[in-house]
Amino acid sequence: WQVTGVQTCALPISCMIRMSVNRILPFLLLLVLFTSCNRKYKIEGSSSVTSLDGKMLFLKTLRDGQWVNVDSAEVIHGHFKMKGRADSVMMVTLYMDHEGIMPLVLEDGKIVVSISNTQLIAKGTPLNDKLYEFIDKRNSLEVKIEELERKEARMVLDGANLDDVHGQLAKEGETLVKEMNDYVRQFIVDNFENVLGPSVFMMMCSTLPYPVMTPQIEDIMRTAPLSFKENTLVKDFLTKAKENMQLIEEQKRMKQNASVGGQK
């Protein structure tokens, strides 16, 4: 993401993860890669959140614009289980009622889910391991960036010169933001050919106020394979982003012409 912070979610359960899950889920849930019909998934979950006990949890995905339940289970004494055929590898979401809790990759194998007041984790299969390693690393970088503000206040209170503090922390902030953006970019590149690449790309794009081509996006697209560019959501975003770039250029030309006309 080209920003230094991610908004936290207002929902009581999904706030346990730093990422704004509800904001990115619509993009995640649409990204599907069809594979063998003979594979099976098994989810074994545990929760230390007492409010979940006795509640029904659902796996949901979007199909043809409609929310569809893929599977469900009741939380009994802090545990829940789901299993079924993995007809496709897809991004799904674990829900309680209408609250999105966490994204998952539904794929062949045993997926271990852990829910607590401070952390959400899914592991045990290759893509879930990759996804949550990515989330953890990016969140840790975000925490370091947020810590710079508190560090500035401490340094000033300790008597440091304000201008010197600004200069030092600005450099530290630029370094951390670059590290985070480079990490996100490389993760997308490394996962061009599976659901994680398009998913994280759309997460990144969802932080923009509207579709637009940024240097980071242009850099990613320079090396992206055709399969990535032809992904429905990626292709739709790029089309809108390029249209917006043309509008921005037209507005610039109109302002320049108006400025020149006013000087005559």
Label each PLM-derived region with a short phrase.
Residues 129-133, 183, 188-195:
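Soluble oligomerization/assembly scaffold segments of membrane-associated complexes
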Residues 10-46:
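Bacterial Sec-dependent N-terminal signal peptides
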Residues 189-192, 196-264:
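Charged, long alpha-helical assembly modules
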Residues 1-13:
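Single conserved hydrophobic/aromatic residue that forms the stacking wall/gate
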Residues 4-7, 22, 235, 261:
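N-terminal non-cleavable signal-anchor helices
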Residues 37-181:
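A non-transmembrane, solvent-exposed segment enriched in polar/low-complexity residues
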